[in-house]
Amino acid sequence: MQWGHIKTLFIISFLILNIYLVFQLFDRQHTADMNVLDHSESTIEEQLESENITIEAPLETELTEASYTEVTQKRLSSDDMSELGGKKDQTAAVINNNFIVSVFDDPIPLPTPYTSESITSEVKNHILNADEYELWGWNTDTNVLLLFQNRQDRPVYFTQNGLVLVYLNEDNEMTHYTQTILGEGEAQGGAKNLIQPIQAIGTLYNRGDLHPDEVVTEITLGYYARIATEGVQVFAPTWKITIEANEKEERHYFVNAIEGLVFESDSTTFLTEVMRDQLSKIKTLADDSEVRTYVEKQLDDRLEIENQSEGE
C-alpha cells in the first residue's frame, strides 16, 4: 500500500515537471520569435547604425524605373576610319572593323598632379568618340588606365565591347592604347521598377558583404552585362556600390537594380582576360606590322608578369 502511494506521488511529480518544462519551452520560443520580429521590423538604416556602418554617398531616390538595354558592338564607319587616320601623333591598326590598337609616335606623359579629370582630358585628346568614355581607374598591377563607355549617360561596367585601355611605361607615359566602341542601345522590354539604393545596400549587408565600421562612399547607377552573345549584349541597370574598409582598402560591388543579383569584378582579373583576348587578335595582323611587333611584345611581357604574380 505504501509503495502505491509513493508510485502515485512520483507520477504526479513528473506530470508537474513536464507541465513546467512545456511552459518554459513556449516562453523561450515566444521570446525568440519576438526577437526575430523586432530584427525584421527594424529598418536597414537601424541595422547599419547598430554596426557603425555609415553611408556617405548621396542616394538617387528620384530614379524609380529603367529598362534592360540591348547593345551591339559598333563597326567603324568610313568617317571613323578617316578621323582615326587623321590623328597625327599615333599609328593605328583596325582589326575586324571593330577593334582599334594604336601606338603613339612618342610616349605621352600624363599631366601632373594626377587627377581623374586631368588624366581623362588627356586621353580624350587621342581617341574616337571621346565624350562617351569616363575613367574607371588606374590599375597599378598592370599599369593600365581603364575607361568605360557611357550609354544613356551611364557607365557600362566591365565589358570588352565598350572599353579603352591605355598602357603606360615605367615613367607613367602613355605608349599605346586599345579601343572598342558600343553601338546605340535599344530598350528591351518595358520599364521595370528599380530596387532603391538603400535596398541595394541592404542586400550587401544581408549577404555579409558589409562589415562593422565600414563606409559606403559611393553608389551610382550604371549598366552591367546580364546576357552576352556574339556581337550582342544585354545590359541591366545596376547599382555600383563602393565600400571603404580603411583608407587603403576599397571594394566595388554591382547590384542588379531590377533582380537584386550581386556581382563582383576585380579589375586585374578583368584586364588579364582582356589582354589575353587582345593578344590573340593582334596576332592576326601582318607579321611585318610595326603595331603588331610593339604591342605583342608589350602584352607578352605584362601577361608574363601577371602569371608570375598569380603563381606566388
Language-model features: locations:
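Exposed beta-strand-loop-beta-strand "reactive/processing" segments of non-cytosolic proteins
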Residues: 124-170, 220-255, 266-267
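Preferential activation on post-signal-peptide N-terminal prodomains/segments
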Residues: 1-134, 143-155
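Short, solvent-exposed aromatic-acidic interface loops
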Residues: 179-185, 270
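A short, polar/proline- and glycine-enriched secondary-structure boundary/capping micro-motif
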Residues: 157-158, 185-194, 264-266, 274-277
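Structured extramembrane domains adjacent to transmembrane segments
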Residues: 162, 176-181, 190, 201
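Non-catalytic, structured segments within soluble enzyme domains
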Residues: 168-173, 179
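Short, non-transmembrane alpha-helical segments in secretory-pathway proteins
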Residues: 96-144, 153, 185-227, 287-294, ...
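Extracytoplasmic/luminal low-complexity segments enriched in Pro/Gly and acidic/polar residues
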Residues: 197-312
